[in-house]
Amino acid sequence: MNRLIVLFLIVTMICATIAVPSREELEDQKEYKRSAALAGTIIEGASLGFQILDKVLGELGKVSRKIAVGVDNESGGSWTALNAYFRSGTTDVILPEFVPNQKALLYSGRKDTGPVATGAVAAFAYYMSNGHTLGVMFSVPFDYNFYSNWWDVKVYSGKRRADQGMYEDMYYGNPYRGDNGWHQKNLGYGLRMKGIMTSAGEAILQIRISR
């Protein structure tokens, strides 16, 4: 009997020393799981915002030139990824293959690894179920003494992959400066665009495509 009492006391002491996660700690763990590996995925379109894109930036680590991109599909149709073309820099993720209506794609880019003078400059393309191509361009330069952040969105007739020509068409066309302000325009084909890009070297680009 005495042995059982001693054993019970020992087990009780051991259990008392085991840390039980608090509610706050459990919430932090859930939040970490939700935010892990966001770039290259699809989320609910209504949930896209700066908070999500900040987490995408955080995934890229301590990189001086990087960008988190979110594009909300409210076009009424579905999109299929074609490709991404990087004029400068690179990415660690693949474009989400399929973006249904009312979903948003998350993507990211960064400068090349090492002490190299590159930014994150690219264009990517999605083939839309209406038979046309959605092109997105962003430019986060290395040297802000000569360049600024720029971005644009354009719809191309038919199917067209992203390449240097698509990038230059938007970059040298009439792009929007990354000025921390909202911009909108008519894309044609019954679609509209509204978006914003921040001005820093760790940039956020949020876009909404709608009817």
UniProtKB/Swiss-Prot annotation:
The record marks 147 as: Important in the initial contact with the lipid membrane. The keyword Transmembrane applies. SUPFAM superfamilies: Cytolysin/lectin (SSF63724). One of its GO terms (molecular function) is channel activity. InterPro entries: Actinoporin_PFT, Anemon_actinoporin-like, Cytolysin/lectin. Octamer or nonamer in membranes. Monomer in the soluble state. This is DELTA-stichotoxin-Hmg2a. It comes from Heteractis magnifica (Magnificent sea anemone).
